[in-house]
Amino acid sequence: MDLNNRLTEDEALEQAYDIFLELAADNLDPADILLFNLQFEERGGAELFDPAEDWAEHVDFDLNPDFFAEVVIGLAENEGDEITDIFARVLICREKDHKLCHILWKE
């Protein structure tokens, strides 16, 4: 993989959020979608992290944080707080030539 051909943090966040919006209706409960849409302006967010260790239970490849990122999308208690009501965790490949993502949805 090429370190010089990676998505920036902002590009990774934007791409993960776009994928979330495209697939949310098929994967979230309608009540959760309504709550997210009503509250996102005030309490919503997307945060970028290195991939959590539990992704190893869901994927069968090395999760090098140079090339993979986890984006947590959801709602916080208050604006600026950490996201506590998680609607999706998106694992995304940051290399521009490898379009790969996995999503763990709120159950």
From Swiss-Prot:
It comes from the Bacteria. Gene3D superfamilies: dsDNA mimic, putative (3.10.450.140). Disulfide bonds: none annotated. Pfam families: DUF440. Belongs to the putative dsDNA mimic protein family. HAMAP family: Put_dsDNA_mimic. May act as a double-stranded DNA (dsDNA) mimic. Probably regulates the activity of a dsDNA-binding protein. This is Putative double-stranded DNA mimic protein PC1_1990. It comes from Pectobacterium carotovorum subsp. carotovorum (strain PC1).
